[in-house]
A protein has these predicted regions:
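N-terminal alpha/beta PP-like core and its mobile active-site loop of ThDP/TPP-dependent enzymes
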Residues: 2-231
């Protein structure tokens, strides 16, 4: 399927699946907050396998111009995000649906953890009203991801979606690089909130300007000062 045709199909699917949305500019959905926050963190591509729990995120990514690469297996998506992060030095992003979508990505996330690769894994979950009640593909994702990530948490309010993505991205680049995981329930993604209550942190202001292992350009600066010193 061509990129343009895929984009159109995702857009129509998202529109058909979501509850009727307000067109007012003073409200924003959780899915669009995810996309805006990812864009602020420099993400221009997400790797995923399409799933119903995360369809709202695709809708936001299409509006924000973030490329959606839809693969055949979530392990592939996780490895692709890892490879993207290693080659670009930027935050890689893998988005999976609940249950087997998350578990299929575990090997790729574990590889990123041992390789100190900065990737953000966003996973879907059933609605909060159905959490841990045996709903479709409901599993303890955060518990499973905690040992192989630097940061793993659920997001339980739409207002905090962007804030939590910023926090997770910060952990990816703090100290030794590595992956973070966020679980976002379907109703949190689908809900609309006043835009004023959903603050999106400024991008990148929390990050160090040098690599944790020593940026060659910054090491050369004091070396040059020492060489030119008279005493």
């Amino acid at each position: 399927m061509s990129d343009s045709k895929f984009t159109g199909e995702v857009s129509r699917t998202a529109s058909d699946t979501l509850a009727k949305k307000s067109t007012a500019g003073d409200v924003i959905s959780g899915g669009h907050l995810v996309a805006k926050a990812l864009k602020n963190e420099g993400v221009d591509t997400i790797f995923t396998l399409c799933g119903g729990h995360i369809i709202d995120i695709y809708d936001g990514c299409l509006d924000e111009g973030i490329r959606i690469i839809d693969v055949r297996h979530e392990q592939t998506a996780a490895h692709a995000a890892d490879g993207y992060a290693r080659q670009t030095g930027r935050l890689g992003c893998v988005v999976t649906t609940a249950g087997p979508g998350c578990t299929n990505a575990i090997t790729g996330v574990a590889t990123a953890f041992r390789s100190e690769s900065p990737i953000l894994h966003i996973g879907g979950q059933s609605s909060l009203t159905q959490h841990r009640m045996g709903s479709l593909q409901d599993l303890p994702h955060v518990d499973m991801m905690t040992p192989i990530t630097k940061f793993a948490s659920g997001v339980f309010s739409t207002e905090r979606v962007a804030d939590m993505i910023s926090m997770a991205a910060r952990e990816c680049f703090s100290g030794a690089y590595g992956p973070s995981y966020l679980e976002i329930p379907r109703d949190v993604l689908d809900a609309e909130v006043p835009a004023a209550r959903a603050v999106i942190p400024k991008p990148g202001s929390y990050r160090a300007s040098v690599k944790s292992i020593g940026d060659p350009a910054d090491i050369e600066k004091p070396a040059d000062i020492l060489v030119k010193a008279e005493r």
